[in-house]
Regions:
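A generic structural motif
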Residues: 17-24, 56-57
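Rossmann-fold dinucleotide-binding core
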Residues: 61-127
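Active-site rim beta-loop-alpha module in soluble metabolic enzymes
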Residues: 105, 111-153, 159-164, 171
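Glycine-rich adenosine-cofactor-binding loop
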Residues: 1-14, 188
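NAD(P)-dependent Rossmann-like dehydrogenase/reductase catalytic/cofactor-binding core
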Residues: 18, 159-160, 164-226
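Rossmann-like NAD(P)(H) cofactor-binding subdomain of soluble oxidoreductases
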Residues: 8-12, 27-88
Length: 226
């Protein structure tokens, strides 16, 4: 149920895997198997209640890490990834949440989706980690490209430069941990940071504030851990 990014990507994945499936527009009645609810966060709880009431033999799966719902037939399958309609789900590791149920997990494995069972409900810190990993990265990448373009770089060159820096930075930190953190804050170069802060302030005071807060946090983090 649902025709957004996750719903479409999931439907395409199941079809390619030759798993029998169909898209439904409303809660079915007296069905069995697995119903995937790829709907907005606000719609998850009422739909879960309706689906489980009308279908005693069904397992319901939703994708909203911010939604908690207590039932031995309701599960959260969280992608911990940025999904669009063309995403290849066979490359994504999902986290599975809910009451431990080996028979349901066997059914889910038959779909070909990769997942790891993580417990009853995710904590707010789990979701905060996803926000930091995904949304923060997306936001700062877009801002970094805009800064390059405002300095005269083309959109194409800006994207190539930012992409290679992001990818190499992630490679370094995954390989070397805190030793892979580079840049003026990691080196304690406060004069450079101050100069860049004031330059940013002339363009966007809010962004400059985020820039300063992030660099202050990096400086403290590296100092405490090294």
């Amino acid at each position: 149920m649902g025709r957004g990014n996750v719903g479409t990507a999931l439907f395409n994945f199941l079809q390619l895997s030759e798993i029998a499936c169909e898209i439904v527009e409303k809660a079915p009645e007296n069905k069995s198997g697995i119903l995937f609810l790829a709907v907005s966060d606000s719609a998850v709880k009422p739909l879960l209640e309706e689906v489980l009431q009308k279908n005693p033999g069904i397992f319901a799966v939703h994708f909203s890490a911010a939604t908690h719902f207590e039932s031995d037939r309701a599960f959260l399958l969280h992608p911990f990834s940025s999904i669009n309609k063309k995403s290849e789900l066979n490359h994504i590791l999902f986290t599975l949440w809910g009451e431990k149920n080996p028979s349901f997990e066997e059914m889910l494995k038959k779909t070909g989706l990769k997942f790891v069972y993580c417990g009853g409900n995710p904590t707010p810190l789990y979701h905060a980690s996803a926000v930091m990993s995904g949304n923060f990265t997306q936001f700062f990448v877009l801002q970094a490209m805009q800064l390059l373009q405002s300095s005269g770089f083309s959109k194409e060159v800006s994207e190539k430069l930012v992409r290679q820096l992001v990818n190499s930075s992630l490679d370094n930190v995954f390989r070397d941990g805190i030793k892979g953190v580079t840049g003026p804050a990691a080196r304690g170069e406060k004069e450079i940071l101050s100069e860049e802060f004031y330059a940013l302030s002339e363009k966007d005071m809010e962004l400059a504030g985020l820039f300063k807060a992030a660099n202050d946090a990096i400086l403290r983090f590296v100092s405490e851990k090294s």
